Amino acid sequence: MNDANKLPSRPLLAVSLSLALAVGSAHAQAPAPGAPLTIAQIKAMLGEQGYTKVDDLKFDDGLWKAKATSGDGKRGEVRIGAQGGRIYAEGARSKLSEAEVVASLTSQGYSRVHDVKYEDGLWEAKAQTSSGQKQQVYADPTDGRVVSAQND
């Protein structure tokens, strides 16, 4: 039998299988695209971003909300997108103006956009869907996309 047809040694095979299993199990723990995040994943994400003392973690208005201390020692409210996991911190500045947010919501199919305000790191507005349903909408401060929408 030539060298190309030989099986790898048992120790090498064992190491290879162990690595394959480790990579497979790590991949299995990652959330599926579009899947809602768990409390453990939310806490881990906040910790990775330097937040400590995470309290009062709850799901409300289609968003995760918590009180936490940031890496620079400031205590405040954070909101976390339920599916994307993006963190919106109280006191963070918006890259969009109110008019740009209204334009973004309109381009996403909303009409009668009003009561627009920037609060706790997210834009909030009342709007109407194309089917006429009134909703409370939360929009991302960097691109204006809807993070959460709840029937009003």
Please report, for each region that a protein language model flagged, where it lies by residue:
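Bacterial N-terminal signal peptides that target proteins for export
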Residues: 2-13
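Bacterial N-terminal signal peptides
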Residues: 12-22
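Sec/Tat signal peptide C-region and signal peptidase I cleavage site
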Residues: 24-28
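Short, non-transmembrane alpha-helical segments in secretory-pathway proteins
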Residues: 32-52, 93-112
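N-terminal secretory signal peptides
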Residues: 35-75
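Surface-exposed aromatic
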Residues: 62-65, 86-88, 118-124
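Conserved histidines in hydrophobic membrane contexts and catalytic metal-binding motifs
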Residues: 64-66, 125-126, 136, 144
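A short, surface-exposed beta-strand/turn
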Residues: 76-87, 135-148
